[in-house]
């Protein structure tokens, strides 16, 4: 199926002018982007001069770029967890919760590879995010991304969302449901998605999406919010899913964003001819009827053993048992296990050992797995945190005038660019 034919089939709600704009925007190539820890915005711009920060308000730390030959993933700052690469329209979604002043318990039901979790966690360091993924391999990749970003407020779990037990009903203040979909919003980025697209896939996905959204409604706290999103333009996976699951306990909330979007009956679509991204549908729901659960009165999980090994979020101690946790928090430093403690930054608790600052060229060598030679001789052999611009890159051991590399070989980045 050709791209034009696909949009004619899928986007029947668009007029001819809108379909033409959508086709033209895809033929020019998708915008790429990333989310940056706010204090590093200027530093990232210095290292990646081809990026722009075109957004404002809640998305002021999201950048865009268009050049297809650029490789921002091969930069020292990316290795150090300063930014995470993702579609800007994907970054839009987790920024649409209504503002409140409480410490929120958040569930990302289908979190891998982690873009929405990371975007949210950076902006809300006091909240606790349960980032769940049904696939073990994808959950492990999710955990690696969370570790690289050094986020202390994220717990990674591996569960079928439908199997989250009833003990968790009505306790999550905010839920992200980026549901598995047929992927028509990714035709530009992933041409194979166009080759594999069928209407049968749309129908199969819509059935799963309805089940997941019904589960999300059960898990959502009274007055809590759900952001339902897909990267599909099919109405059957978007508004029709919302309509099929609406009941008296749920109300639709308008997304009051400063950005232009395509308004639908129940949500918004971020078409690439309107928004600098690849495409996303999002709908915002609020639970207005249901049981009010006091999380402080729940029978809590036993985290005593975990607490001795990890710095964990206080809310974890109040959650019921039943989560299949892969990564419960930030590992506490142990000099017998230095290779497991790779990243540390503003959002991670750094062990109280010496830092050694190196140049960008030295940082590239270190990340590739090499030793780093220093201009100073050190009389004491000791473990140190190797930093660039005060951004921790990993651990090393000083011996005389060099730093022996303690990065695990599996983390070497041989293609890192000067």
Please report, for each region that a protein language model flagged, where it lies by residue.
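Polybasic, low-complexity RNA-engagement segments
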Residues: 1-48, 276-281, 288-418
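A short acidic, Gly/Pro-enriched loop at the edge of an enzyme's catalytic core
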Residues: 101, 163-176
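Conserved class I S-adenosyl-L-methionine
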Residues: 102-112
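Conserved SAM-binding loop of SAM-dependent methyltransferases across substrates and taxa
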Residues: 113-125
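Helix-to-beta-strand junctions that scaffold the AdoMet/dcAdoMet cofactor pocket
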Residues: 124, 220-222
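S-adenosyl-L-methionine
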Residues: 132-169
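Mobile active-site "lid"/loop adjacent to the S-adenosyl-L-methionine
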Residues: 137, 174-214, 231-238, 257-258
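Class I S-adenosyl-L-methionine
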Residues: 172, 225-228, 232-310
